[in-house]
C-alpha cells in the first residue's frame, strides 16, 4: 500500500477467502480453506502470525520455470527438513494478542530435535503447538529459546516420535549469503501445500524492517531478495544450491513489490551452538538502537574525512556505518551517547557491522565496554556497563481481577523511547478494562500507591478487598503525555485468584502458582445523598421523576446467550423504592451471570441482583438493598392506560454523557414490531411488542428514559433494544423505542407482592397483517367486520412469522402453529392487539381459532414455561463456552441437533485453533452420542490431557461435520458454571479434573477473558500492524 508516497512492508500472511453473502454461521470448515467471515481456517489455524493491518496484496507468483537438475536434487533434500508449525499463543502477552496461527520452520538438529523459526512464531508469551513434517507425521513442539530482540526462536520436538521418515537437518551457513546468490525459499502455503519460490539476493545491508506497533527486530542488518514469499512462509529456510540454509524468511513488502527480507543466520547459529552445549545464550545490551546509515548521511552528522578514510581503507566494501538512533532513558548509555552519534570503535576495535557489535556485547554481560563515537565532528569516548538483555525481557506475568500484567518489555520501551520499567497491562479486561482498549496501558499507581514494577503492583493488589473501588493512575504507551485517572471496581469474587505464571524453558510451559487469596469484601454501610435539581424546567413532574432514575452497570464474567459485550451501562427506573425494585432494559442486563451495580443520585453505589427477566419484551427487574440508600428515592407511578398515537407527552431521557435531557413532544406512531434477528449468531431480542416513537430528535440520542404526562405519571419506558450486527461494519445496531407501562403492571404487581412470575408463552413470533392481506389468505368477511369493530384504530390480525423449535416435552401429535397461520381468537377472544396475547402467560393450553390455507381450524395450543428457556448452566471446555440452546437459538432454528451448543470461544484456545465455531452443535464425542451437557462432560472427562479426540458437530444450517481437537488441560482446564440460588453470587463454579469435581474453579484458572472471546464468526483484524 502506498501511504503518502511511502512504501510499507509486511510479514507474509495466508490469503483469506472472500466473505460469503450468507451468514458465516451457515458454513463449516472444509479441508483446506478458511471459513468465510471467520478468522479460523478449516485446517485449524486462525490467521497467519505474520498478518498485518495493511490490505496491500502480495504479488502473485507466475508459473515457475523448470529448475536445473542440481536445484531439483537440492530441493528434494531440503523439503524433508521443513515443517509446518501450527500454534497458539494462549493469552495476550507483550506486543501480541492471544491468537492461533501457523508458520514454517526447519530442522537444524535432527538428533536433539531442534527447529529454527521466527521469534514471532515462538511467541513471547505462552506457546502451545505442534509441527507437521513432509510425510505428514505430527509431533508436539515447545520453545527452548526465543531471542529478546532478533526475529528467531528455537523449538524442540521428540525425534523418536517421527517413525516413518529419516530425519534430516539443514546446516546453517550464514557466510554463504552473498549479493547475486541464487536462492530458494522453501515454505508452507497455509500448512497444506509446499511452496518453493526462487529469488536472487540483492542486498546484505538493509536495516531491519519496522512492523509498526507490534514486535520489531532491530540492531541487525537484513538480507533483501526478490522472492515474494507467500502466506505461511514465515520461518522458512532460505537455501542455496548446496542445500545449506543461508538466511531465515522474516518479512516482505506490502505494496505488491516482489521483495522479501531475510534474517542473517549468524546469531541463530551462535544460539543453537550454546543450546547444544547446554550453555545459556547470553545477550548483552546498552539499551541503544543502532541503524546503518550510508557515508553521505554520516558526513552530514559530522563524520570527519580522516575517519571515513580509515573506515574505507579497513573495509573497502563497506558503504555505511552504525549510527545511534534511540538511547533509552535510565539505560547504561543514557547521558553518555546521543542520537546521531556515529560509532567508530568498541574496545579499540574499528566497527561497522551489527554482527561484531552483537559479539562484543553478548560476551560482555556485566562488564564495561569503551565506545568511541563522533558527535558533530568531535571524538567522544564513553564507557558503558553492558546489561543483561534477558533481564529486561519479561518471562512472567500475573493475572488478578480479570487483567493480565507484566513488566514493561525492552521491545515496547525501544519502540516508544521510554525507560524499560513499569507495569504493563497486556490484557486489559475485568476490573482493568480501561477505556475499551485491549492492551497498552502502563499502571503508575493503584490505590494512591506507586507501582513502579510488577512486584510492587502485586503487593498493592494483595491488600485490596473484593468489591473495593480504588483510584488508579495510568498512561497509554502510545500517548505518554496524557495521564489518566480512573476508579476501578476490584472483582475478586468471579476472579478470586491472583496467579503468577513463570516461563519454564525446560518444559516449554508456563508454570502457574497462586499468590494470595482475596481479601473479603467490606460490609457496605448506608450512605446519604441528594438528587440534582433541574434548573429552567417548567414542568414540576420532570423535577420529581429525576428521583426515580438510577444508573445501572452490568458486568458479565462469561459470554453467554450470544451477547456481544462484557460490560454495559444504562439507566433504570425505580418502581418500588421501599423494596428496591428497578426496571431496566434487557439489552443492559441480558442474563443473571453478572455483577450489577446501581448508582443512586450520582453518589451512592450499591449491589443489585436479577429478580425477573421477561422472555419477549426486553426488560429485566433487578433489586437492591434500600436500607443502604439514605436518599429521597421516589417510586415512579406507572400509568394503567395505554398511551395513544398523537397524544402529547414529555420525553425525559439520558444522553451519551449520562446527562438528563427533556423535551415536550407527541407520539408519532405505535407499531407492532419484532427486533430483527442477528444473522451471524442468535441472541436475545424483543418480539411481539408495540413500539412507541415520538417526534423529537432526542429520542435517537437517548438510550434510556421515560415518557411522562403533565401529572408525572409514567406512560412509557424508553428502552434500548439490541438488534442485528451489520455485515459490513460488524457493529451492533441498537434501537431506541418506547414501551407502554400498562404491559409491565401484571408482572410488577406480583413481584411487589413477593411472587416471582413464572410465565408461559406460545413458541412463535408473529407480525401484523392488514385486512387486504387477510382477505386474500382466507379470512372471511365476517371476521374482517369483527376486527373493524374490535379495534377501530388499527384494523389488523397477527400472522405467524416463525415457530420456535418445540421443547422436548412437546409430543409429536400435539397441536401446533405453523408459519403462515393467521390467529383469530385465543380462548374465545379476538386478537387484534399485542396486549391481548398476554393471556398466554398464565395458561398451559390455549383454545385457538386460526386460518390455515384458507380454512378455519380449532387448535389446543400448549404453552412453553419460560424458566426452561433461560440459561442455568455453562461448560467451558478447551476454550469453548457450551450451553443449552438459549431462547434466541430456538427462535431461529427449526431443529435442535443436541443440547450442547457452542456459544462463544476464546482466542488462542484449542477450540479456536481447530475450528469449533460459535453456533455449532456438538452431537458426539469419539463416536459416543452426547445429547446434553451431562453426557458431554462425562465423555470428555475420560479423555487424557494432550490427546486428540473427535467431535461430531452440526452447523446452524444442519450440515454435519467432524472436528479433531487436542485437549489442553494446562492452559484450558474444563470448568462449569451452575446456577445455584443458595450461593452468594447465585452461581457456583466447578472444575472437572480427571473425573474429580472441585468447587471454586474460576475464570482465571480456565484462562477466560470475555473480551477475548468471539460469540460469532467475524473477520478479525490482523494482529500485525502496518510496516513502514
Swiss-Prot record:
Residues 1-46, 991-1028 are annotated as: Disordered. This is Pro-apoptotic serine protease nma111. InterPro entries: PDZ, PDZ-like_dom, PDZ_6, PDZ_sf, Peptidase_S1_PA, Peptidase_S1C. CDD domains: cpPDZ1_ScNma111-like (cd06786), cpPDZ3_ScNma111-like (cd10827), PDZ2-4_Nma111p-like (cd06719). Its main location: nucleus. GO terms for cellular component: nucleus. The keyword Nucleus applies. Residues 82-266 are annotated as: Serine protease. Its EC number is 3.4.21.-.
Amino acid at each position: 500500500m502506498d501511504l503518502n508516497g511511502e512504501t510499507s512492508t509486511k510479514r507474509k500472511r495466508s490469503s483469506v477467502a472472500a466473505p460469503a453473502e450468507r451468514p458465516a454461521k451457515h458454513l463449516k470448515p472444509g479441508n483446506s480453506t478458511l471459513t468465510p467471515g471467520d478468522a479460523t481456517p478449516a485446517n485449524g489455524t486462525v490467521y497467519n502470525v505474520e498478518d498485518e493491518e495493511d490490505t496491500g496484496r502480495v504479488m502473485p507468483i507466475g508459473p515457475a520455470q523448470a529448475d536445473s537438475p542440481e536445484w531439483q536434487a537440492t530441493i528434494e533434500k531440503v523439503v524433508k527438513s521443513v515443517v509446518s508449525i501450527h500454534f497458539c499463543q494462549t493469552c495476550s502477552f507483550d506486543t501480541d494478542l492471544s491468537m492461533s496461527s501457523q508458520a514454517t520452520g526447519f530442522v537444524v538438529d535432527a538428533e536433539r530435535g531442534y527447529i529454527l523459526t521466527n521469534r514471532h512464531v515462538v511467541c513471547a508469551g505462552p506457546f502451545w503447538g505442534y509441527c507437521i513434517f513432509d510425510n505428514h507425521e505430527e509431533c508436539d513442539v515447545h520453545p527452548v529459546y526465543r531471542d529478546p530482540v532478533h526475529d528467531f526462536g528455537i523449538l524442540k520436538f521428540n525425534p523418536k516420535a517421527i517413525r516413518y521418515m529419516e530425519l534430516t537437518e539443514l546446516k546453517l551457513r550464514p557466510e554463504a549469503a552473498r549479493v547475486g546468490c541464487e536462492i530458494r525459499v522453501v515454505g508452507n502455503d497455509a500448512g497444506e501445500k509446499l511452496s518453493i519460490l526462487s529469488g536472487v539476493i540483492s542486498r546484505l545491508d538493509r536495516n531491519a524492517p519496522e512492523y509498526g506497533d507490534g514486535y520489531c527486530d532491530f540492531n541487525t542488518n537484513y538480507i533483501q531478495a526478490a522472492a515474494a514469499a507467500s502466506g505461511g512462509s514465515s520461518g522458512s529456510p532460505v537455501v542455496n544450491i548446496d542445500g545449506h540454509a543461508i538466511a531465515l524468511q522474516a518479512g516482505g513488502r506490502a505494496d505488491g513489490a516482489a521483495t522479501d527480507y531475510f534474517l542473517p543466520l549468524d546469531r541463530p547459529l551462535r544460539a543453537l551452538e550454546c543450546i547444544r552445549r547446554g550453555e545459556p545464550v547470553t545477550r548483552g545490551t546498552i539499551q541503544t538502537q543502532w541503524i546503518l546509515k550510508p557515508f553521505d548521511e554520516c558526513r552530514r552528522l559530522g563524520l570527519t574525512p580522516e575517519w571515513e578514510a580509515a573506515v574505507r581503507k579497513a573495509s573497502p566494501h563497506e558503504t555505511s556505518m552504525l549510527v545511534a538512533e534511540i538511547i533509552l532513558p535510565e539505560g547504561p548509555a543514557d547521558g553518555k551517547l546521543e542520537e546521531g552519534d556515529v560509532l567508530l570503535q568498541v574496545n579499540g576495535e574499528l566497527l561497522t557491522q551489527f554482527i561484531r557489535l552483537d559479539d562484543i556485547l553478548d560476551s560482555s554481560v556485566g562488564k564495561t565496554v569503551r565506545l568511541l563515537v563522533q558527535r558533530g565532528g568531535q571524538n567522544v569516548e564513553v564507557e558503558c556497563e553492558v546489561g543483561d538483555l534477558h533481564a529486561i525481557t519479561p518471562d512472567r506475568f500475573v493475572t488478578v481481577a480479570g487483567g493480565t500484567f507484566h513488566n514493561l518489555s525492552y521491545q515496547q520501551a525501544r519502540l516508544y523511547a521510554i525507560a524499560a520499567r513499569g507495569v504493563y497491562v497486556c490484557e486489559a479486561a475485568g476490573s482493568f478494562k480501561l477505556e475499551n482498549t485491549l492492551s497498552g496501558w502502563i499502571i503508575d499507581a493503584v490505590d494512591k500507591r506507586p507501582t513502579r514494577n510488577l512486584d510492587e503492583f502485586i503487593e498493592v493488589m494483595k491488600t485490596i478487598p473484593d468489591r473495593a473501588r480504588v483510584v488508579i493512575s495510568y498512561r497509554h504507551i502510545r500517548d505518554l503525555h496524557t495521564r489518566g485517572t480512573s476508579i476501578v471496581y476490584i472483582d475478586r469474587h468471579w476472579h478470586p485468584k491472583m496467579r503468577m505464571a513463570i516461563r519454564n524453558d525446560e518444559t516449554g510451559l508456563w508454570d502457574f502458582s497462586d499468590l494470595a487469596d482475596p481479601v473479603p469484601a467490606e460490609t457496605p454501610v448506608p450512605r446519604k445523598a441528594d438528587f440534582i435539581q433541574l434548573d429552567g424546567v417548567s414542568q414540576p413532574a420532570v423535577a420529581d421523576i429525576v428521583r426515580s432514575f438510577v444508573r445501572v452497570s452490568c458486568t458479565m464474567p462469561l459470554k453467554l446467550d450470544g451477547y456481544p459485550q462484557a460490560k454495559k451501562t444504562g439507566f433504570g427506573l425505580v418502581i418500588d423504592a421501599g423494596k428496591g425494585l428497578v426496571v431496566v432494559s434487557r439489552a443492559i442486563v441480558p442474563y443473571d451471570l453478572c455483577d450489577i451495580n446501581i448508582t443512586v443520585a450520582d453518589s451512592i453505589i450499591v449491589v443489585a441482583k436479577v429478580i425477573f427477566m421477561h422472555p419477549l419484551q426486553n426488560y429485566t427487574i433487578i433489586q437492591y438493598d434500600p436500607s443502604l440508600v439514605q436518599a429521597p428515592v421516589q417510586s415512579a407511578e406507572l400509568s394503567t392506560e395505554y398511551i395513544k398515537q398523537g397524544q402529547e407527552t414529555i420525553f425525559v431521557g439520558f444522553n451519551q454523557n449520562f446527562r438528563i435531557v427533556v423535551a415536550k413532544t407527541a407520539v408519532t406512531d405505535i407499531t407492532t414490531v419484532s427486533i430483527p434477528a442477528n444473522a451471524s449468531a442468535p441472541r436475545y431480542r424483543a418480539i411481539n411488542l408495540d413500539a412507541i416513537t415520538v417526534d423529537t430528535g432526542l429520542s435517537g440520542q437517548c438510550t434510556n428514559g421515560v415518557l411522562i404526562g403533565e401529572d408525572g405519571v409514567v406512560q412509557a419506558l424508553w428502552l434500548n433494544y439490541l438488534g442485528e450486527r451489520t455485515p459490513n461494519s460488524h457493529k451492533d445496531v441498537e434501537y431506541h423505542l418506547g414501551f407502554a407501562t400498562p404491559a409491565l403492571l401484571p408482572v410488577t404487581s406480583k413481584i411487589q407482592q413477593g411472587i416471582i412470575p413464572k410465565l408461559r408463552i406460545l413458541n412463535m413470533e408473529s407480525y401484523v397483517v392488514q385486512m387486504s392481506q387477510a382477505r386474500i389468505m382466507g379470512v372471511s368477511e365476517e371476521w374482517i367486520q369483527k376486527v373493524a369493530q374490535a379495534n377501530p384504530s388499527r384494523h389488523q390480525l397477527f400472522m405467524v412469522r416463525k415457530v420456535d423449535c418445540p421443547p422436548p416435552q412437546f409430543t409429536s401429535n400435539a397441536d401446533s402453529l405453523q408459519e403462515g397461520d393467521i390467529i383469530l381468537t385465543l380462548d374465545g377472544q379476538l386478537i387484534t392487539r399485542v396486549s391481548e396475547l398476554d393471556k398466554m402467560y398464565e395458561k398451559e393450553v390455549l383454545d385457538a381459532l386460526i386460518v390455515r390455507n384458507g380454512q378455519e381450524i380449532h387448535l389446543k395450543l400448549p404453552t412453553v414455561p419460560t424458566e426452561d428457556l433461560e440459561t442455568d448452566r455453562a461448560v467451558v471446555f478447551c476454550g469453548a463456552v457450551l450451553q443449552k440452546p438459549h431462547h434466541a437459538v430456538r427462535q431461529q432454528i427449526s431443529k435442535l441437533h443436541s443440547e450442547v451448543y457452542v456459544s462463544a470461544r476464546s482466542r488462542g484456545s484449542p477450540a479456536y485453533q481447530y475450528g469449533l465455531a460459535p453456533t455449532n452443535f456438538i452431537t458426539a464425542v469419539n463416536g459416543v452420542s452426547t445429547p446434553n451437557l451431562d453426557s458431554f462432560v462425562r465423555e470428555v472427562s475420560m479423555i487424557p490431557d494432550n490427546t486428540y479426540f473427535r467431535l461430531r458437530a452440526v452447523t446452524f444450517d444442519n450440515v454435519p461435520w467432524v472436528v479433531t481437537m487436542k485437549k489442553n488441560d494446562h492452559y484450558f482446564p474444563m470448568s462449569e458454571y451452575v446456577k445455584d440460588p443458595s450461593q452468594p453470587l447465585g452461581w457456583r463454579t466447578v472444575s472437572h479434573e480427571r473425573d474429580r469435581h472441585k468447587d471454586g474453579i474460576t475464570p482465571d484458572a480456565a484462562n477466560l477473558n470475555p473480551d477475548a472471546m468471539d460469540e460469532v464468526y467475524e473477520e478479525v483484524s490482523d494482529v500485525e500492524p502496518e510496516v513502514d
